Amino acid sequence: MTRGFGPFGKIQEALKKAQEVRDGAQRLQKELEEMEIVGEAGNGLVKVTVNGNQEPLKVSLDPQVLQESVDVVEDLLLTAMVNAYTQSAETMRKRMEELTGNISLPGLGLG
């Protein structure tokens, strides 16, 4: 008997579940890289696209926004960036919860 894990069968079960989480995390990483999440500002005049890892992919500006002052354009860009980042981070958090939410690792006091 290994201290903290109980009988050998529980160790095998814990290792199997850990492998499932690892495999799921690898799939999730690929999904996050392929996602496109759009943050907007100014009723869609400014759009920033990031992937599920919060990496910037694209910025789109409606030509109408270029008639505004530099300060306004900067504020709109920042707002769209924060919006995209927030959505991406929340998506990542939810997906990680889905991945690990039902996993119980016996003997570790988790789940």
Swiss-Prot record:
InterPro entries: YbaB-like_sf, YbaB/EbfC. The keyword DNA-binding applies. Pfam families: YbaB_DNA_bd. Keywords: Cytoplasm, DNA-binding. One of its GO terms (cellular component) is cytosol. It is found in: Cytoplasm, Nucleoid. One of its GO terms (molecular function) is DNA binding. The keyword Hydrolase does not apply. Its main location: cytoplasm. Belongs to the YbaB/EbfC family. Homodimer. PANTHER family: NUCLEOID-ASSOCIATED PROTEIN YBAB (PTHR33449:SF1). Binds to DNA and alters its conformation. May be involved in regulation of gene expression, nucleoid organization and DNA protection. This is Nucleoid-associated protein CYB_2894. The lineage of its organism: Bacteria, Bacillati, Cyanobacteriota, Cyanophyceae, Synechococcales.
